């Protein structure tokens, strides 16, 4: 095979993430690859909140179509955007590693989160982030904003917000770590399921899958699979009020989860053998559901 074609979203972050995978392929196999840029439904409908336009697969379906049409050998996704069940034609061939999983606060004026004024306006499009912000500071006014990192930063200025909440992973991959004012403790302010992880999706039995399988990160796979199992048991998606944190502790996996039940955020944790990661995620969900 002379060249691999990798489908991805058009955003700057999606392209940077795909270039990370392209670099790994080049160093491991000395094989060239190129990007196929796709505008997804989630990218087209920026004026509507994600939970109103339907959660599952908004950033994935259009890219999967390129795989079905054999226009690309693989797709690179942020795993937090991937529904817990992928269509039978596809597989998540590799989870390639996780960047910093934490959420961060970017201040419009270099004021730390704990010091922002009473009634401060904080921008986020995530109901998970909004709910956890309210738990920390019930006085905050949550302002829904959507778009890529650059768009949200621009909206923070235009709408005179006191700050916004974003994922550390995206900022670090873009080289914008210097914008971060505060990091939230991921055990207290739980990230999205699979936050910070990159996944490679292929058609089952695709002729190029072997290249992507070589990029699997075992530890990241264990934690992401556990978190996705947790989400699946709750029948949630990336726009539900679900958060998860997991870490490998020697031979064990420790996991914390949150879920909204009747307007109340329920938080539980679990510890068990890491080889039972999928079952652990399921049990944590059952523990939360009571």
Swiss-Prot record:
Binds 1 dipyrromethane group covalently. Pfam families: Porphobil_deam, Porphobil_deamC. It comes from the Bacteria. InterPro entries: HemC, Porphobilin_deaminase_cofac_BS, Porphobilin_deaminase_N, Porphobilinogen_deaminase_C, Porphobilinogen_deaminase_C_sf. The keyword ATP-binding does not apply. It catalyses: 4 porphobilinogen + H2O = hydroxymethylbilane + 4 NH4(+). SUPFAM superfamilies: Periplasmic binding protein-like II (SSF53850), Porphobilinogen deaminase (hydroxymethylbilane synthase), C-terminal domain (SSF54782). Its EC number is 2.5.1.61. The modification S-(dipyrrolylmethanemethyl)cysteine is found at residue 238. GO terms for molecular function: hydroxymethylbilane synthase activity. GO terms for cellular component: cytoplasm. It is an enzyme of class 2 (transferase). The keyword Acyltransferase does not apply. Keywords: Porphyrin biosynthesis, Transferase. Pathway: Porphyrin-containing compound metabolism; protoporphyrin-IX biosynthesis; coproporphyrinogen-III from 5-aminolevulinate: step 2/4. One of its GO terms (biological process) is protoporphyrinogen IX biosynthetic process. Its cofactor is dipyrromethane. PROSITE patterns: PORPHOBILINOGEN_DEAM (PS00533). Monomer. Belongs to the HMBS family. The porphobilinogen subunits are added to the dipyrromethane group. This is Porphobilinogen deaminase. It comes from Clostridium botulinum (strain Eklund 17B / Type B). The gene is hemC.
